Amino acid sequence: MSGQGPPPSMTPQQQHMLMQQQQQQQMMRQQQMQQQQMQQQRQQQIQQQAQQPYQRARTPQMVPQGGSPGGAHLQMHPHLQPQGQMQPRSPLVGAQLQAPSSVPTAANPTTPQMMQQQMGMNQPMSLPPTHVSRPGSVAPPSSVPVNLQHTSGAPGLPGSQMEHQYPMHLQPQQQTLSRPGSQQSQHIQQPGSIQRPGSVLAPGSIPPGGPASQTGPQSIQVFGPGSVQPPGSTQAPSSVQPASTFNPGSIQAPASQQPPASVQPPPSAASGSTVAGAQSSKEPLKPNEEQIRMVQDPVDLVRNLVQKDLRNSLVEMNKRGAELVRQKQEGEVNEDGKAQYSRATNDFHAVCDEIDRTLTTVLETAKQLSKLDKVFFDRSSRDLDGEVMVNSVQNFVDNTEIVQRMFDDTIGSVTSSMESMRRRQKKWEDQHKNDDVEMME
């Protein structure tokens, strides 16, 4: 199709579009051929290096100096790895790395389909090239292209996934088997290196700052200090280690969990130890009469009022009344006696009003409880689910709001009708008054 020219009946726009499609198809074919060549070269290199025996260390102490202790811990415990990277561990991890001298320079993808295909195969948890620290003596040669990481993520290449998954878990035996100019020098930390890049499995914890910020991920603190730090000289200096280990005993309760200082129970119900612990720095506030009545039971409050306050006020009122009657019989009525009797009468009436309000509150509460008992349809099980209870109460509140809105609308409609009627009546009266004035003139 590429050798044939466009038919003469096509317009120039159609011919231009056809030429663009042919060019895109040719570029896609070239990219596919390059990917096939890369796959064949990698398979040949795997067959050559598969004969080199090596022994993988099984202890966290074999982590190279300057490596990531978190990576070694996750290597020994694969069940702690994220779900997106739980892949079978292959013995050919070190052998699947390709020498940069045999890697051809890949063309940049120009079509959106190829760009999405190449970028979609890369591991989402892999580190970008700028976050991997390496000494200057093992820098990769200039023949390695910058977009090698993108081209290695082509479909059908198992080495690309393992290369991004285990770059920081290679053991010292694998360093001796790698060739001097291979790509492994980009990921292995030498013993003389000071920087410690974080684990590839948790790149989100590595800040994009300088070398001091790449000492280790903070998400490995939950495993304990013994399982994430290698012994000896491979440990990080004290200036870059975490501030404190995971010790539940050292965690203090926040101040918000302590009882507030503004709300105090009555003296009869508060314990001395609780008040002393909560108000160690400040003097406890003395509860006034309103706070005491707020925390008391209404029934107990009525009982106390009847047994104490009502009796005392009644006795005081009778005493002042008898004194006033005696003074009246003697003919010497004192104004001070009248004031004391009035004060005693007011106190008695205040106690009676308080008892009336409290009993009214108790009765209204009992009515509301009887309504709520009808709301909960299932009263057989004592342990009701919180969600079911909230939904039932919410339905009751919604229905009550609907009824209240109906009353408000009715009252508002009647009020507006009365206002409009009065405005018309006033207007009619003003108009007839003007007519009467004109007739009189």
From Swiss-Prot:
Residues 1-294, 416-441 are annotated as: Disordered. Pfam families: Med29. The keyword Nucleotidyltransferase does not apply. Its main location: nucleus. Residues 283-292, 427-441 have a biased composition (Basic and acidic residues). GO terms for cellular component: mediator complex; nucleus. The keyword Transcription applies. It is found in: Nucleus. Disruption phenotype: RNAi-mediated knockdown has no effect on seam cell division or differentiation, but in a sel-7 mutant background decreases number of seam cells. Partially suppresses the hermaphrodite gonadal development defect in a lin-12 mutant background. GO terms for biological process: lateral inhibition; positive regulation of Notch signaling pathway; regulation of cell fate specification. Residues 98-107, 171-193, 230-250, 272-282 have a biased composition (Polar residues). Keywords: Activator, Nucleus, Transcription, Transcription regulation. Residues 1-10 have a biased composition (Pro residues). Residues 13-52, 108-125, 132-146, 252-261 have a biased composition (Low complexity). Disulfide bonds: none annotated. It comes from the Eukaryota. Belongs to the Mediator complex subunit 29 family. Component of the Mediator complex, a coactivator involved in the regulated transcription of nearly all RNA polymerase II-dependent genes. Mediator functions as a bridge to convey information from gene-specific regulatory proteins to the basal RNA polymerase II transcription machinery. Mediator is recruited to promoters by direct interactions with regulatory proteins and serves as a scaffold for the assembly of a functional pre-initiation complex with RNA polymerase II and the general transcription factors. Involved in development of gonad and seam cells. PANTHER family: HOMEOBOX PROTEIN BARH-LIKE (PTHR24330), MEDIATOR OF RNA POLYMERASE II TRANSCRIPTION SUBUNIT 29 (PTHR24330:SF19). Component of the Mediator complex. May interact with sel-7 and sel-8. This is Mediator of RNA polymerase II transcription subunit 29. It comes from Caenorhabditis elegans. The gene is mdt-29.
